[in-house]
Amino acid sequence: MDLWPLYDQADYAAFGSLFGVRNHAGFHPLAPDRGLPVDLSSGLRSQLESWVAAGDMYGASWVSWAELASLDPAATPGHFVGRLTWHAKSLPSVLHQQLVPDPWPPEALAVVGTPTPGPHSTMGPVEWTTGELMCRYEPLTVGAVLGPETHWPHVFAVMKALAGRFGDDGVRLVVAFD
């Protein structure tokens, strides 16, 4: 089943937490570099293998519903504490994102300003306005990058429903990255 109707984001923090792809945040990935499953359908295998062989794909991996269902949403990455997202009020469709360590880098604060009550006391998502910018900070956890404000719950709902019929280990998500 193609994920396009369910998931149409390119969130590298999520891909890093699940598969280790572009894992700039430093998450401990759940299913890194597994390649294609040995029992993958021949049609999908031939399509994906040709893309990987041609250098059009970075790599492939897969993860079972059993593994996804056991994820710890409070798990944090090793390199960063949060993610800043901002956009101009006049261009809400053009989002900018930056992963931030603790303390926040001065260049990030110069762009987005200082949230109230301050960058070091934010325990949950915080939104604020700086001039023409709408800004948001969220702590960086597995739950934040795969949670309800993302498109992943749609994917997980379908996988959970299929697992009800085929078992938790009988349902998996197969991915390939360019």
Where would I find each of the regions flagged by the language model?
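Acidic (Asp/Glu-rich) sequence patches and key acidic residues
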Residues: 1-168, 178
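Conserved GNAT acetyl-CoA-binding A-motif
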Residues: 170-173
